[in-house]
Amino acid sequence: MTLKILQWNIWYKEDIDKIVEEIKRSQADVITAQEFIQHSATDLDTAKYIADKLGFNYFYHTADTWSGREEKEAQGNAIFSRFPIVSTQHTYINPPKHNPVNALEEGRIYVETTLDVKGEPLVAGTTHLSFTPGFEITEQRKKEADNLINIIKNKKTNYIFGADLNAGPDSYVIKEFEKQLSNVGPDYREKTFANQPFDYYGMYQVEDLEWRLDYLFASDDIKVTNAQIMETEYSDHLPILAEIEI
């Protein structure tokens, strides 16, 4: 059976209705995605909003929380599916801090769903690894990656993983992933970041599409028939769309 898988960091500042439009345009069956936010004062819940607009099943879990931030109280990752979700799980790979002082200190979470694809099980996982200026792989980031690898190392069949790994193709993070799973996204030379000018508190800027930070991996039994970087005006990351056979 052929499925379309979409991986996208939607950027929490983006117009959520534009994100919905682009997801619909992709005709994706399963979406792994990052930077969903919640705020109780405005009843904001971007993961639920997207799921409702698509008519999809979904699972979201918070990675970290803040007090007194105008734009968000919580941020996390989500998986959306055209098919029923049989079970879910989540694991923190960097514990939540509540009011983290910078991006490296933020909690990071692995989110997983088991889907029933017309009688066939398919496990989908996602995460959003820590940001460092220049995407430097520090010892802390290596530890975070190792925590993630310990989760996925036994995923040998019917498994897909999409994520913003905040790491380039030649990094420790990606090299470790390649020992466990196969790339089912486009060639690593195709870039996904920054789709819009990026400025991290004046410490680090990216003006153009200079980096590949977003990936789709799968167990060896899954065959990829097509993969592309989607062009869009929205979000600071470009989405990856792949067609797979299970």
Regions found by a protein language model. Name each.
Residues 12-15, 38-42, 67-69, 98, ...:
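Active-site environment of divalent metal-dependent phosphoester hydrolases
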Residues 1-56, 60-73, 146, 246:
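N-terminal, active-site-proximal structural segment of metallo-dependent hydrolase catalytic domains
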